[in-house]
Amino acid sequence: MIIDYLAQQDPEVAGAVAREVERQQHNLELIASENIASRAVMAAQGSVLTNKYAEGYPGKRYYGGCEYVDQAEQIAIDRAKTLFGAAYANVQPHSGSQANMAVYFALLSPGDTGLGMDLAHGGHLTHGSPVSFSGRLFDFKHYGVKKETGTIDYDQVADLAKTHRPKMIIAGASAYPRTLDFEKFAQIAASVEACLVVDMAHIAGLVAAGVHPSPVPHADVVTSTTHKTLRGPRGGLILSARADFGKALNKEIFPGIQGGPLMHVIAAKAVAFGEALTDGFVAYQQQVVKNARALAAHLMEQGIELVSGGTDNHMMLADLRNISVTGKAAETALERAGLTLNKNAVPFDTENPTVTSGVRIGTPVMTTRGMKEPEMAVVAGLIVNVLKNISNDTVIQATRKRVMELCEAFPIYRDNDNG
């Protein structure tokens, strides 16, 4: 096995990898942006394709010897187009942020106006945050959620679009638990002659399985990561229903912001897209949402407030102000108990961003491990018990023991699965 070669060559790095395997096996990952890639995905990513330089695109490379990496990339492109019903796909972005950067460079000029979701309301850094390239190079305005419902204020989106007439509107979020109305976003964009870009990084797996409406028919361009709910390698993806956008988008990836593509990662993306085209993947995504709704219901029954009152997708955002616990304190205590999640600002949060008033909770990893609704009731109880006894070491240690038992019953990889 590859890990054996690593242990012989570099015991220090092998030790870190081995300890991470143990951490993943014996802790419950509730981070909404994480998942467990299959062994096949990891095999492709750890293959000899890492040795090959291949600047350019299939059939149009700047290096010789690319005939087989061309095949791998074309498989990834074709599968991505089939999976999402797109006319165009670029599988070369190294990350979701670089996919967004390339799209912005294709559609905007420095100083142009964009409209995106406020980071404090669930958006993403690359949707115009002033600390991101997006906010530094472009003039972004931001929409948010309604205070009374926690759902996107589409009237505000329309008003801001009418007032500022952005050249581009971006829909998508990193901490929004409800279904996005892509048709409404498209109507607003059309009303001001703006391009609509959808960043579906968090919900790509749900979209692929038909569990969440697809943005592809409504958006000019769609970006995504290939991990998260899609359960592939870490990387980025650009899609469009408009084949005529292809040339402009391609040149912004290469030579615009990247040189040689990561062919081993592209091969792993191809494997992940192939897995996502199976009936088993559809069933998996359906269970992800069932688990999220079950977990949300059990948390609310036990007094935990959730932004928007629940979830439609793979995540929920808990507002802990009613139990006087900060997101930072919750993250620390839950991690000690073997429950890994992340502190997260909630809409209209008054806490420091490094402290926050909430936590983000997701079900993709638990679902990959094979857990279903009965386990969500157990996990909800464990979470609430820690949150309500946050300084009680006895409770935290007892919870840790129960988490270990649950993890043993649902290993991250089974001998008879694709992991």
UniProtKB/Swiss-Prot annotation:
Q: Give the record's pathway.
A: One-carbon metabolism; tetrahydrofolate interconversion; Amino-acid biosynthesis; glycine biosynthesis; glycine from L-serine: step 1/1
UniProt keyword annotation of DNA-binding present? no
Q: What PROSITE patterns is this protein classified in?
A: SHMT (PS00096)
Major localisation: cytoplasm
Annotated site (Plays an important role in substrate specificity), which positions?
227
The compartments listed are: Cytoplasm
Which residues are annotated with the PTM N6-(pyridoxal phosphate)lysine?
A: 228
Q: Which reaction does it catalyse?
A: (6R)-5,10-methylene-5,6,7,8-tetrahydrofolate + glycine + H2O = (6S)-5,6,7,8-tetrahydrofolate + L-serine
The residues that the entry says bind (6S)-5,6,7,8-tetrahydrofolate are: 119, 123-125
UniProt xrefs under InterPro entries: PyrdxlP-dep_Trfase, PyrdxlP-dep_Trfase_major, PyrdxlP-dep_Trfase_small, Ser_HO-MeTrfase, Ser_HO-MeTrfase-like, Ser_HO-MeTrfase_PLP_BS, SHMT-like_dom
Q: To which protein family does this belong?
A: Belongs to the SHMT family.
Report the protein's function. Answer: Catalyzes the reversible interconversion of serine and glycine with tetrahydrofolate (THF) serving as the one-carbon carrier. This reaction serves as the major source of one-carbon groups required for the biosynthesis of purines, thymidylate, methionine, and other important biomolecules. Also exhibits THF-independent aldolase activity toward beta-hydroxyamino acids, producing glycine and aldehydes, via a retro-aldol mechanism.
| Protein name, as recorded | Serine hydroxymethyltransferase
Query: What species was this sequence derived from?
Result: Desulfosudis oleivorans (strain DSM 6200 / JCM 39069 / Hxd3)
State the gene name recorded for this protein: glyA
